[in-house]
């Protein structure tokens, strides 16, 4: 049995904790894999060039990606971010859906379209708790790039568009177990998304807006 000096053990513990806290980044710069995870391609999503770099564009009809990973499984606190471009289409769209295997526990980024504008909907269902943060008065023009985020600190659930808080609620969410992610559609293949996604980031702690991904400037 190896015996490590106290300093070595401390370094190993700190390294393990740092790895556990490291965010998972999904850059949408290819179709066959995202964040190192293989994808199942549904319909005809397209890889496109944008001022922000490569992105995946979805047609709002039948295109989506499915990843056999729930990137926030086990997280008691979290920050979930994305940079995306909504391009109109159907009124209700579910564009990023994390689902625990074998249960109804899930986390969604959704949007609603109204007269060439959209508003954000962040939803979590976990254990005996569920909450949608949605404000129809918070309208944003379609066709531009946006940063959106949902943050849970173990007590309060908040959401943001371009770093500005739009909703908040005190609630308890149980950590979710392993599962899958659908991108561009709800997991049961309804409410397809029309637009493009550049990046998503999943962090296992509550970030402040100052720590968010940089806002899109083009």
What is each model feature region?
Residues 14-17:
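N-terminal signal peptide c-region/cleavage motif recognized by signal peptidases
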Residues 1-8:
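Bacterial N-terminal signal peptides that target proteins for export
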Residues 67-70, 134-139, 170-172:
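Beta-strand-rich interaction surfaces with strong enrichment in secreted/lumenal proteins
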Residues 22-38, 47-49, 61-121, 156-157, ...:
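Extracellular glycan-recognition modules
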Residues 169-196:
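Flexible glycan-contacting loops in extracellular carbohydrate-active proteins
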Residues 121-147:
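Short, aromatic/His-centered strand-loop micro-motif at the edge of beta-sheets
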């Amino acid at each position: 049995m190896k015996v490590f000096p106290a300093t070595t053990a401390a370094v190993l513990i700190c390294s393990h904790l740092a790895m556990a806290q490291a965010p998972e980044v999904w850059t949408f710069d290819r179709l066959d894999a995202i964040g190192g995870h293989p994808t199942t391609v549904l319909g005809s999503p397209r890889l496109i060039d944008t001022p922000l770099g490569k992105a995946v564009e979805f047609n709002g009809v039948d295109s989506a990606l499915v990843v056999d990973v729930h990137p926030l499984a086990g997280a008691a606190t979290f920050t979930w971010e994305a940079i995306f471009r909504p391009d109109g289409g159907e009124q209700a769209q579910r564009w990023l859906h994390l689902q625990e295997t074998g249960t109804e526990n899930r986390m969604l980024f959704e949007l609603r379209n109204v007269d060439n504008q959209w508003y954000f909907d962040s939803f979590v269902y976990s254990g005996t708790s569920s909450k949608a943060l949605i404000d129809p008065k918070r309208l944003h023009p379609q066709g531009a790039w946006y940063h959106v985020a949902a943050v849970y600190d173990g007590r309060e659930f908040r959401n943001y568009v371009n770093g500005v808080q739009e909703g908040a609620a005190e609630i308890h969410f149980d950590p979710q177990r392993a599962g899958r992610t659908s991108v561009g559609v709800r997991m049961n293949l309804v409410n397809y998304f029309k637009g493009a996604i550049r990046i998503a980031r999943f962090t296992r702690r509550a970030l402040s807006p100052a720590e968010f991904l940089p806002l899109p400037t083009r």
